[in-house]
């Protein structure tokens, strides 16, 4: 984690940000609204508090165990396997929640055995869009917002604005630039939320932003954009399923393949609809 407009980075900064400025009711957006005053408070907390990070080797790839103390009181929370999976809660030695964890099992996650290209295509083109609107609208809104912030602000290497400056405003350049700008902003302190794919913000940005840019460029309807995003997201998930939740293989590669499938989907469907109108 990197906190914007500061040199605070890493797990210690993330823990301090959650303690000082976290809003538990916002779930995965727990530190989305950190103010400049809270940033100063986080710095002060880091200066005054001994935060220790240790590597745990227990067969669980994604495993976070947080223990805090104040005076005579203590509390411990454990998250394992995936980001919202709280498996242990303890306060002053009293165990309040205790769910066994067996390695990297994903039995509690969605069954992906039905995912293949034929079923993905059929689902994306036949589902009632009202059933998926509440999932896809936040992805469009949030991911476009952080990409636009990345293009406006000074984040990381500013790859998005560099691409636009050097290669022009062609749709192919914009598709790359928006994804890069969103990633630069996300990884360099922008607190705006990102709708993820396969547990990853960069995969969520890569799977969605190029598709949105292409759909807007060709004037595709909102429905066609939804269906193209379904193709992109599900292809990304399908490819990622064979890799595993955490891997040295960069998941953005899978998301790039998903984006290519989504762009092809919206282009093909939009042109087919346009040809039908011409024949009429």
Task: Set out the residue ranges of the language-model regions.
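Glycine/charged-rich beta-loop-alpha catalytic/anionic-binding loops adjacent to active sites
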Residues: 185-196, 236-246
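Conserved phosphate/anionic-ligand binding catalytic regions in large, soluble enzymes, centered on
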Residues: 194-208, 252-254
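Signature of multi-pass transmembrane helix bundles
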Residues: 46-189
